[in-house]
Amino acid sequence: MIDNHYVQSSAKALSQIAFEEKKEKLFLNQLFIIKNIFSYNPEVVEYLASGSIKLENKKKFIEEIFDLIEPLILNFLLMAVEDNKIKYLDNIFLKAILTINKKLNIENGIIYTTLKLSDKKLLEIEKKLSVFLKKEVKLLNLIDKELISGYEIQVGDFKQRNNVASWIDQMALSIKKGD
C-alpha cells in the first residue's frame, strides 16, 4: 500500500528544495536518472529494502553508487534508507519531476515501447514533439509488453499510435469503408 501523504510531502519537499537552491534542471536530470536506475534494476530496490542487510551496508552502497549525485538528493536517499521508505522512491521521484516540470512549463509525456529507447533516440523524439506541439516536451519511456511492435506516445491531449494494433485498426476501418 502506498503511503500517499508520505509520497506527496516528500515530493513537495524535494521540488521546493530544487527551486530554493535554484537547481531545478539539475534535480530534474538526477531524479530522472535515479528513477530509471531503480525502475530498470529492481534488485537494487530489493537490496535496499531488505531487512537482512545492515543499515550501514545499505548507506555505503548508496554513497558508492551515487557518489557524483547532488548532495541534497544523496541525503534524501540516505534518509529514505534509514526510514525504510525505499519502496516509495519511484512515486516520490515521479511526483517531484512532474511538479518541477509543471513550474518550468515543461509538458510531460509517456512513450510506450517494446524495448527501452536509447537516450539519444528519446531526446530526438522529444525535440520533434517540442517543435510540433510548440512547447518543451519531456518523455518518460515505459516498456509495454503488450505492444507487438512500434510505439504509443501521449503528451497531454496529444496521442499518437504507430504499432501493430493501430495498423490493424486502420485496416479494419478501411475494409468497413469498402476501400
Swiss-Prot record:
PROSITE patterns found in the cross-reference section: ATPASE_DELTA (PS00389)
Keywords: ATP synthesis, Cell membrane, CF(1), Hydrogen ion transport, Ion transport, Membrane, Transport
GO cellular component: plasma membrane; proton-transporting ATP synthase complex
Family annotation (Pfam families): OSCP (PF00213)
Domain of life of the native organism: Bacteria
Annotated InterPro entries: ATP_synth_OSCP/delta_N_sf (IPR026015), ATPase_OSCP/d_CS (IPR020781), ATPase_OSCP/dsu (IPR000711)
Assembly behavior: F-type ATPases have 2 components, F(1) - the catalytic core - and F(0) - the membrane proton channel. F(1) has five subunits: alpha(3), beta(3), gamma(1), delta(1), epsilon(1). F(0) has three main subunits: a(1), b(2) and c(10-14). The alpha and beta chains form an alternating ring which encloses part of the gamma chain. F(1) is attached to F(0) by a central stalk formed by the gamma and epsilon chains, while a peripheral stalk is formed by the delta and b chains.
Family as reported in the entry's similarity comment: Belongs to the ATPase delta chain family.
PANTHER family per record: ATP SYNTHASE DELTA CHAIN
Protein name: ATP synthase subunit delta
Gene (UniProt): atpH
